[in-house]
């Protein structure tokens, strides 16, 4: 039985399960597979390398699915010339994308662009936030849906270290817009828990990285299946730019350098280890120890590499069973002997 939440109604999807845009693996193929399975797949446009290549990838995504999909625009600080974010945004608008996910820095400027340009064809906006404080700001800016990312998440979990058991409950207290629970979500029991806490659905990243449709090499996926919930590293904490990645040889080196340098730690100390060029080379070579790559604590709940359809079916079935059987049974009176 499909779940009926504010998210499913607003986005026109069957299941309240999103796969947010991700660096490297947020491809049209993965987004289409998630959307075709009844969720919302999101293509990360910056993966294309340029706005015009992004345009072609959006068109290719449209050829792969007739279901709703989203496009991610992540705005991050840059040590060199920043990416052409406004050009990416214009491509998204010109290609008639209906759902946009933003992440990173404040989306205010781009929200204005999307709202102004969409006219009658309203663009639904989702923004990833790592705290209720940031989520409330996003609501004021006019974001339609909040992706509330707990400390368990891959990538950038923020600096406040609030896990989802508290964060989602606070979201339910404070937010008026629909929101999804993001970070560490890999199972249907967690979907049921998120709904119980007040979320309207879940966003899964790491879980969909370990699928057949993800473009990551098998060596990465194998390490995820073998991994435990303790096999991630928080790096760059001293720079207030915390990032959660898989615990491999490179991540361990970064962790050791950061610890040894203490208050004198500087990004230059590890730039040669964490730069994107090295990470991309490791991915292309299938070397799971060659560079850093993101993974959330949910890897401890991943034990196979199924298709996106199988992930979706299993999560929905588990969530329904948890609610109908496990939770309802706790309220049923027991016979007394």
Language-model segments: which ranges?
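Active-site entrance/lid segments in N-terminal catalytic domains of soluble metabolic enzymes
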Residues: 1-175
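Active-site metal-binding loops of divalent metal-dependent hydrolases
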Residues: 22, 184-185
């Amino acid at each position: 039985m499909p779940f009926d939440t504010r998210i499913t109604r607003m986005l026109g999807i069957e299941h309240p399960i999103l796969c947010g845009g991700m660096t490297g693996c947020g491809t049209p193929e993965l987004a289409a597979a998630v959307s075709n399975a009844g969720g919302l797949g999101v293509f990360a446009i910056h993966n294309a390398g340029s706005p015009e290549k992004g345009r072609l990838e959006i068109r290719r995504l449209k050829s792969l699915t007739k279901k709703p999909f989203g496009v991610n625009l992540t705005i991050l600080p840059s040590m060199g010339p920043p990416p052409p974010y406004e050009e990416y945004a214009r491509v998204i608008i010109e290609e008639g994308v209906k759902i946009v996910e933003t992440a990173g820095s404040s989306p205010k400027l781009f929200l204005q662009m999307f709202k102004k340009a969409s006219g009658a064809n309203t663009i639904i906006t989702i923004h990833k936030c790592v705290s209720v404080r940031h989520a409330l700001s996003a609501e004021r800016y006019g974001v339609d849906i909040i992706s509330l990312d707990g400390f368990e998440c891959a990538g950038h979990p923020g600096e406040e270290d609030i896990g989802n058991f508290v964060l989602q409950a606070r979201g339910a207290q404070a937010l008026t817009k629909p929101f999804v629970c993001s970070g560490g979500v890999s199972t249907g029991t967690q979907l049921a828990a998120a709904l119980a806490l007040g979320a309207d659905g879940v966003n899964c990243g790491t879980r969909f990285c370990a699928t057949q449709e993800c473009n990551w090499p098998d060596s990465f996926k194998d390490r995820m299946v073998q991994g435990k919930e303790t096999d991630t590293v928080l790096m760059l904490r001293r720079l207030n730019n915390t990032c959660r990645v898989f615990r491999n040889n490179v991540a361990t080196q970064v962790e050791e350098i950061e610890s040894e340098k203490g208050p004198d730690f500087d990004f230059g100390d590890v730039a040669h280890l964490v730069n994107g060029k090295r990470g991309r080379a490791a991915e292309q070579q299938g070397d799971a120890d060659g560079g850093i790559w993101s993974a959330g604590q949910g890897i401890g709940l991943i034990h196979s590499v199924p298709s996106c359809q199988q992930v979706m079916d299993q999560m929905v079935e588990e969530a329904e069973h948890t609610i109908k059987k496990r939770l309802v049974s706790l309220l049923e009176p027991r016979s007394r002997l």
